Amino acid sequence: MTFKDLNITEPILKAIEEKGYANPTPIQVKAIPAALTGKDILGCAQTGTGKTAAFAIPIIQHLQALKNWDKSIKALILTPTRELALQISECIDDYAKYTQVRHGVIFGGVNQRAQVNMLHKGVDILVATPGRLLDLMNQGYIHLDNVRHFVLYEAYRMLDIGFIHDIKRLLPKLPKEKQTLFFSATMPDTIIALTNSLLKQPVKITITPKSSTVDTIEQTIYFVEKKEKSKLLISILHKTEGQSVLVFSRTKHNADRIVRVLSKAGIGSQAIHGNKSQNARQSALENFKTGKIRVMIATDIAARGIDINELPLVINYDLPDVPETYVHRIGRTGRAGNLGTALTFCSQEERKLVNDIQKLTGKKLSKVEFAI
């Protein structure tokens, strides 16, 4: 099947071809036709499967067909982090380049002046994080009366305890008659129950079993004393010289500490987490994507904007508290049919978390005892 078979219009097809995409992914095959008919969608597919295009392409096509153009926001895409908002905005920029559809992105952590100026000029699609969106709404800069399409991206994070209050404040501001699209890499039962109350007879799309891991990723657990994790990391990085490596840390403090430890060992790295300025985070991401640095230390929330198709190695320096997060983390490697490796460092107190991960994914992980 090709994108042309999905009844996508010529201007968007041209942009897709320029991106080098020949065939749609499974989530795109199922979601794009349904979205083009205006149906609500509840879509669950792993990281790196093309979810962004699955909602962006039909929304652009819907808006391009409008006869009456004005400055109002017609599509709202809500996402949990600044990095992910920027990533989605870049995709829309690519797919909409040969259309009249205008889009913009807003997020916190930067001066609002440029964002307000952009809103005054008018945008058809607005990509936003919840905090800045509500802030600018309260100031009277944003009105959602004409929103026809509402997207909640990475729904399991957006509807988590940290965002639920923002979502509840936002929903009454949206028109009752609209298309609602929920997309996420994981869809726990608690989220499904909540989305069922917000979606109208949605088309439910699940491309892989929830919280599964792809077969292209070789997964290994290293049982190691907590104090020896740094030595193990340095050893592995020396053995994988030349490869880009994404290392996950549970906390911001530990991410910075790992950078210092690696620096003393002569290994250059950068950390990306919520305490870093927006400019610092963007700079670090760019350095990692272009290969200026080969090792990136990231916390889970900050890593949402890291989108590299050929990342060979992911290391879990700390195990995540939530097993679904493990799936998200290692989903950064083994993309688009490429082989990937995921290594996890597990101390004595973290061993129960390994059992939770194996129970969730249905896979036994290879185990290695590490001792200096």
Predicted regions and their residues:
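Conserved helicase RecA-like core
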Residues: 2-372
